[in-house]
């Protein structure tokens, strides 16, 4: 019996908006299909809001969500977004990754 596993490559990008540097950690990550994945955005200053985007290979960035409130948590199916209490960081968690999750994820503040 042949077992085939898919390797997902999820990229993150560094963003700079209005002079604020927002850094994502890790910058890229290989994930096996079915594994969970988490990436973080950290800002040097307090953000009034943060947006998350996804760009599929060869495609344009697609808006996913905007977080405004301190400590806010929002879910979209297998994706969970969180805005830190101090409004200087955010996280994106994908549960049980699928091949449709392949792409570049980035945040902007």
Swiss-Prot record:
SUPFAM superfamilies linked to this entry: Immunoglobulin
Signal peptide range in chain numbering: 1-19
Function: V region of the variable domain of T cell receptor (TR) alpha chain that participates in the antigen recognition. Alpha-beta T cell receptors are antigen specific receptors which are essential to the immune response and are present on the cell surface of T lymphocytes. Recognize peptide-major histocompatibility (MH) (pMH) complexes that are displayed by antigen presenting cells (APC), a prerequisite for efficient T cell adaptive immunity against pathogens.
Subunit and partners: Alpha-beta TR is a heterodimer composed of an alpha and beta chain; disulfide-linked. The alpha-beta TR is associated with the transmembrane signaling CD3 coreceptor proteins to form the TR-CD3 (TcR or TCR). The assembly of alpha-beta TR heterodimers with CD3 occurs in the endoplasmic reticulum where a single alpha-beta TR heterodimer associates with one CD3D-CD3E heterodimer, one CD3G-CD3E heterodimer and one CD247 homodimer forming a stable octameric structure. CD3D-CD3E and CD3G-CD3E heterodimers preferentially associate with TR alpha and TR beta chains, respectively.
GO BP: any one term: adaptive immune response
Domain Ig-like: residue ranges: 20-109
Record protein name field: T cell receptor alpha variable 25
Disulfide bond sites: 41-107
Subcellular location: Cell membrane
Record-linked Gene3D superfamilies: Immunoglobulins
Glycosylation sites: 42, 89
Coiled coil region boundaries: none
This protein's UniProt keywords: Adaptive immunity, Cell membrane, Disulfide bond, Glycoprotein, Immunity, Immunoglobulin domain, Membrane, Receptor, Signal, T cell receptor
One GO cellular component term: T cell receptor complex
Key word Secreted present: no
Superkingdom of this protein's organism: Eukaryota
Entry keyword Cytoplasm: no
Entries under SMART domains matching the protein: IGv
């Amino acid at each position: 019996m042949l077992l085939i596993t898919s390797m997902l490559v999820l990229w993150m990008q560094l963003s700079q908006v209005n002079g604020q540097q927002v850094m994502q950690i890790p910058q890229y990550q290989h994930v096996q299909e079915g594994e969970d994945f988490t990436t973080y955005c950290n800002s040097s200053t307090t953000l009034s809001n943060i947006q998350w985007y996804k760009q599929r290979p060869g495609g344009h960035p697609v808006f996913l969500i905007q977080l405004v409130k301190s400590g806010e948590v929002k879910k979209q199916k297998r994706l969970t977004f969180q805005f830190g209490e101090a409004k200087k960081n955010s996280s994106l968690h994908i549960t049980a990754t699928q091949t449709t999750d392949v792409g570049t994820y980035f945040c902007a503040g």
